[in-house]
């Protein structure tokens, strides 16, 4: 069913990120302001040389006029997109549009570069510069923000490294897997408890006897069925495994850390609850925090509220001083003045000297 105009208007007016015009968005990005400035200068040179060449008696390639007009339109659109901070929304358009402009300019350069006269030489120099800039734009805007070249270029921007849609999608996918895994743990706990209860009832064990869920065990440390009752009837083992089950149900995110492949994900008496994790190592974002030093100092540019679904993030206020141990990647490991340790987004803070934070 096609929605009415009123419903469509209500959908458009729904909750979404609103972007306001700000020239600082363009000026604060060295890559954007430099490439756009060079393109505008090259465009003026091309236009002047083309007008001067068209007054000569010699023929002038007419298709070049359309390339000049198209390049001017592309420059105007890019300035608007940057001023409204819509670059991440239109990266595909900018990349494809720059590719088309690259073809137009290289075609014009082929027709002008071998022509005689200083006027056509100026026009050919302008279209060659435009072709180079367009090729750089295709390479930059065609790549993800997490690519090495984009991260290096964005590191000079006042806004910092832009968030990566690919990495964000990967994190959301892992969080959905975390929720599914926690539900599977709860279902497995209930099934094994019911199975063990049925076994005890079948063997004539008192119904009021405390039983142990196998979720907290490896399930393979005792393969002798004759010794099952002696292990399960231990009061210490009952209490320990009940606590493990409660901890897994209350903290499914922490439980997921120990559920990766080729890693023992169950708690035993010998491990004492200390298991390894590989999901954080794979992402490069989440890892166990030890007693490592924090040699860098950073000041919060904006306030940040940690995600409740991610136990590794920490919140901070604007202007707060943080100690940082690793400045590689989009998430940095940091330590607050209160001693709280966690990860923070790098584009919300600015590195400073130690004496500046005093």
Swiss-Prot record:
Key words, A-Z: Cell membrane, Membrane, SH3 domain, Stress response, Transmembrane, Transmembrane helix
Entry's Gene Ontology BP terms: establishment of cell polarity; osmosensory signaling pathway via Sho1 osmosensor; signal transduction involved in filamentous growth
Membrane topology, from the record: Multi-pass membrane protein
Segments in the Cytoplasmic topological domain: 1-30, 84-88, 142-358
Domain named SH3: residues: 293-354
Extracellular side: 52-62, 107-120
Transmembrane regions: 31-51, 63-83, 89-106, 121-141
GO cellular component: a single term: plasma membrane
A Pfam entry, by short name: SH3_1
Subcellular location, record wording: Cell membrane
Family, similarity comment: Belongs to the SHO1 family.
Assembly behavior: Forms homooligomers.
UniProt function note: Plasma membrane osmosensor that activates the high osmolarity glycerol (HOG) MAPK signaling pathway in response to high osmolarity.
Name the UniProt record assigns to this protein: High osmolarity signaling protein SHO1
